[in-house]
Curated annotation (Swiss-Prot):
<feature type="compositionally biased region" description="Pro residues">
    <location>
        <begin position="159"/>
        <end position="174"/>
    </location>
</feature>
<dbReference type="InterPro" id="IPR051308">
    <property type="entry name" value="Proline-rich_CW_protein"/>
</dbReference>
<feature type="signal peptide">
    <location>
        <begin position="1"/>
        <end position="25"/>
    </location>
</feature>
<keyword id="KW-0536">Nodulation</keyword>
<keyword id="KW-0732">Signal</keyword>
<dbReference type="GO" id="GO:0009877">
    <property type="term" value="P:nodulation"/>
</dbReference>
<comment type="function">
    <text>Involved in the infection process during the plant-rhizobium interaction. Involved in actinorhizal root nodulation. Involved in symbiotic association with the nitrogen-fixing actinomycete Frankia spp.</text>
</comment>
<feature type="compositionally biased region" description="Low complexity">
    <location>
        <begin position="70"/>
        <end position="83"/>
    </location>
</feature>
<feature type="compositionally biased region" description="Basic residues">
    <location>
        <begin position="122"/>
        <end position="132"/>
    </location>
</feature>
<keyword id="KW-0134">Cell wall</keyword>
<feature type="compositionally biased region" description="Pro residues">
    <location>
        <begin position="134"/>
        <end position="150"/>
    </location>
</feature>
<comment type="similarity">
    <text>Belongs to the plant proline-rich protein superfamily.</text>
</comment>
<feature type="region of interest" description="Disordered">
    <location>
        <begin position="28"/>
        <end position="174"/>
    </location>
</feature>
<protein>
    <recommendedName>
        <fullName>Early nodulin-11</fullName>
    </recommendedName>
</protein>
<keyword id="KW-0964">Secreted</keyword>
<feature type="compositionally biased region" description="Pro residues">
    <location>
        <begin position="53"/>
        <end position="65"/>
    </location>
</feature>
<dbReference type="GO" id="GO:0005576">
    <property type="term" value="C:extracellular region"/>
</dbReference>
């Protein structure tokens, strides 16, 4: 009985000696799993190494494509399948006919003929005025006044007049 106990203890000891140098004894299954990409961030951005949620990258939905028009399926075997009609060609563009009568003229009435230009009469000069402006016609204009006899014009002399006129200078008494 004691030998069996010693034998099992020896096996455990030997297994521990072989597993420790290989580096497999201290590893748990949680260390062997790959890191979760959602909760991993660089250390320089998260120095405390707390779990940070990185949302997944948004992908837009695929673009909408309209369904392709298919020819209608003919279920009756006797009838021919209905074909889609091609679009009709456009008629060629025609210019409108030119108007033979003026606009807003009834059709039974003929438009008036253009009259030839008459020669203009020669221009006459207006008659000259016989009386002054702003004078009533029954009143005669005043006659010009005769010139007044004026004395002949004298030239100014350059001589200085005497300081006291024609009187003698006053006597000064000391």
């Amino acid at each position: 009985m004691a030998s069996f106990f010693l034998y099992s203890l020896g096996l455990v000891f030997l297994s521990a000696l072989t597993l420790v140098p290989l580096g497999l004894a201290d590893k748990s299954p949680s260390h062997n799993m790959p890191p979760n990409p959602i909760y991993t961030t660089p250390i320089h951005k998260n120095p405390t190494n707390t779990p940070v949620y990185n949302p997944p990258i948004y992908k837009p939905p695929p673009t909408y494509k309209p369904p392709i028009k298919k020819q209608p399926i003919n279920k009756s075997p006797n009838k021919k399948p209905l074909l889609l009609k091609p679009p009709l060609p456009k008629p060629p563009h025609k210019e409108p006919p030119s108007r033979k009568r003026p606009i807003n003229t009834p059709p039974d009435k003929k438009p008036p003929l253009l009259k030839p230009p008459f020669p203009k009469p020669p221009q006459k000069k207006p008659p000259s005025r016989k009386r002054p402006i702003n004078t009533p016609p029954n009143k005669k204009p005043p006659l010009p006044k005769p010139p007044v006899n004026k004395p002949p014009h004298k030239k100014p002399s350059n001589k200085r007049p005497p300081p006291y006129g024609n009187q003698p200078p006053p006597s000064i008494h000391f």
